[in-house]
Amino acid sequence: MFANAGLSPFVAIWTARAASLYTSHNFWCAAAVSAAVYVGSAVVPAAVAGPLFVGRVSATIKAAAPSTTAAIATLATAANGQLRERGGAGGWVGVHCPVVGGGGVGHPRKAIAAAVSVHSTCMPAAFGGHLGLGDRSRSVSLSGTP
């Protein structure tokens, strides 16, 4: 459990939708994606809102209420190390995408995001971080368009 009082508040992104992800096993599969993305509050002000695109999965950035901080941390634990933390002033971004296939519904495949685009209106231009997905990581780039 993440009972650590030193945890920073997070901005949380949630989306649940059907999509297709290209996996590290080099095949396409229909994916029931339930992604939880967390961005350090030092990187993104609580007031911001906007889209984040991870491959074919899109979500909206929303500020997490203090009461949801524990639930967010629990999701990070449930990701079984699939969340990748990056230290430094840039904060961190992590994604856990359980997909359908192989081990059954919700089985966590090591999916690779083909592209990550964050609107520059959502993130300060100085933001530099990584998206961790399974055992792969991709840079988070800033763009004015998805």
From Swiss-Prot:
<keyword id="KW-0812">Transmembrane</keyword>
<keyword id="KW-0472">Membrane</keyword>
<keyword id="KW-1133">Transmembrane helix</keyword>
<feature type="transmembrane region" description="Helical">
    <location>
        <begin position="1"/>
        <end position="21"/>
    </location>
</feature>
<feature type="transmembrane region" description="Helical">
    <location>
        <begin position="35"/>
        <end position="55"/>
    </location>
</feature>
<keyword id="KW-1003">Cell membrane</keyword>
<feature type="transmembrane region" description="Helical">
    <location>
        <begin position="87"/>
        <end position="107"/>
    </location>
</feature>
<dbReference type="GO" id="GO:0005886">
    <property type="term" value="C:plasma membrane"/>
</dbReference>
<feature type="transmembrane region" description="Helical">
    <location>
        <begin position="111"/>
        <end position="131"/>
    </location>
</feature>
<protein>
    <recommendedName>
        <fullName>Uncharacterized protein MT2143</fullName>
    </recommendedName>
</protein>
